[in-house]
Amino acid sequence: MITWHDLYTVLTAVIPLYVAMILAYGSVRWWKIFSPDQCSGINRFVAIFAVPLLSFHFISSNNPYAMNLRFIAADTLQKLIMLTLLIIWANFTRSGSLEWSITIFSLSTLPNTLVMGIPLLIAMYGEYSGSLMVQIVVLQCIIWYTLLLFLFEYRGAKILIMEQFPETGASIVSFKVESDVVSLDGHDFLETDAQIGDDGKLHVTVRKSNASRRSFYGGGGTNMTPRPSNLTGAEIYSLNTTPRGSNFNHSDFYSMMGFPGGRLSNFGPADMYSVQSSRGPTPRPSNFEESCAMASSPRFGYYPGGAPGSYPAPNPEFSTGNKTGSKAPKENHHHVGKSNSNDAKELHMFVWGSNGSPVSDRAGLQVDNGANEQVGKSDQGGAKEIRMLISDHTQNGENKAGPMNGDYGGEEESERVKEVPNGLHKLRCNSTAELNPKEAIETGETVPVKHMPPASVMTRLILIMVWRKLIRNPNTYSSLIGLIWALVAFRWDVAMPKIIQQSISILSDAGLGMAMFSLGLFMALQPKLIACGNSTATFAMAVRFFTGPAVMAVAAMAIGLRGDLLRVAIVQAALPQGIVPFVFAKEYNVHPAILSTGVIFGMLIALPITLVYYILLGL
């Protein structure tokens, strides 16, 4: 039976963690002590030094020869059960998807064991439960986070191959990834170079593109500073520094537009860009061609852009997907006149001599490298046509797009999305592209099967990318070195030198509080605590605090755990969401809003929920 003294002991261990988190939150939101840049520096210190040294401290001081194999087996079985069910759901049901499988797996099986689990379980069930939590931390860092990274890289590789080689993916027999490419997470603008070998198979080289990506609608990296745009309904996020290899500059652009004095402060979209609105039945004719005529520009028309969140257009030498591209100029006016379900604005411009110009294809901004071939030869060498749609935002930040896909072009856009390889879609709660041909299934259309390279080729590519990510992660080194030292120290009874031990201890002692402080800073910097909507947040919390513990209870009883071991296993599964899965979700843009809500809101409600589990299991 749980006594009031037991509850007080638990609160004594956990409340100080929340005090650190609340202080950090108030320092940013209420007292304005820290700026976003200062918060970034604190988070950097926590990620590189505090948390890795905290992991090393716990792992190196835990006896690996006294590990409870049945407890580890129960934890492993829980994750394998969830993984198996999600794989079946993703591959054999219409509603399944790889993105949601990864998200649900993260929510249900990867709690915040290091920061919350160790102090909470020690207060509840004694020092031995703390040793069990350290064993879970070791498995998480070495096995399960690596598996999660493997799934994210598999998704990135699948998108890359489907978009670059939609028809010839099965013919790829090798990938060579240049050393500066560290991930397929979509943040780097990648390009592929395919060569046909003597055997008729494709040998692909993946490298970074010279063009830097510009991201729209908040889909960019952490270095992007939001600035309001005077383009109607658009919020443009621009990098502070000029991208590498870019010879595009704004002075040349505005001079080309006919403004010798540079950028004017009071220009409007109609005066500068000749934005055509699709709101009316007949769009106003553009005067952009008249302005460009003074610069001897070639003729051009609007062609539907690529899918948001996509890689560069497929290589025409190895894909037959460009057959529909020749119809684009004829469909231009039909597209504009009919697409009246949203407030999309069209923007077209030419940029001369901008081989490395910062262009985003994630939000529909696309550079037509072959524009001169399509509209006739021009004496303006190196001209690139930039085409994009800018849609107005509603008050809550969502575009006025079609009811299901949230893209930029309404009904016509939904028809164009069907032509994207394997029916890529955008989710409503974030800008993640799904890999399932949902529209084709709903409409009963038949879509061509997109063949993937052999499993051995895909596995080698993914392992290369996972390895490059792991060797750049400080937690990888701290976990492995801590485990190796524990194996040596407890096998031959070797003590760590006092100087090294005290040097590690002085930083690791601050790790727990700094980790919670960093989490509070993260909460304060978010515009909303619930970023993905109430219904989605409710679903995420149900998966985190009910599905995970339920599956763990089944797995633990199947292994034969009883008594306190069973209680520790269930309470451990009901801890708040782990931070590392959220970091991965943000890097790969797979439901980051859901994982953010799981971390923030889950931390707020975790204490009463775990106390309820503690009381019920103690009856």
Curated annotation (Swiss-Prot):
Pfam families xrefs: Mem_trans (PF03547)
Phosphoserine modified-residue sites: S229, S246, S286, S357
Induction: Down-regulated by endoplasmic reticulum stress treatment.
Modification sites for Phosphothreonine: T320
Disruption phenotype: Plants display altered embryo with defects in stereotypical pattern of early embryogenesis. The triple mutant pin3 pin4 pin7 is able to suppress partially the highly branched phenotype of strigolactone deficient mutants lacking MAX2 and MAX4.
NCBIfam families per the UniProt record, alphabetical: 2a69
Protein's UniProt name: Auxin efflux carrier component 7
Keywords assigned: Auxin signaling pathway, Cell membrane, Membrane, Phosphoprotein, Transmembrane, Transmembrane helix, Transport
Cytoplasmic side: 29-38, 93-101, 153-479, 525-538, 586-598
Cellular component annotations (GO), alphabetically ordered: nucleus; plasma membrane; plasmodesma
Residue sites binding (indol-3-yl)acetate per the record: V51, N112, L114, Y145, I579, V580
GO molecular function ontology, one term from the record: auxin efflux transmembrane transporter activity
PANTHER family for this protein: AUXIN EFFLUX CARRIER COMPONENT 1B-RELATED, AUXIN EFFLUX CARRIER COMPONENT 7
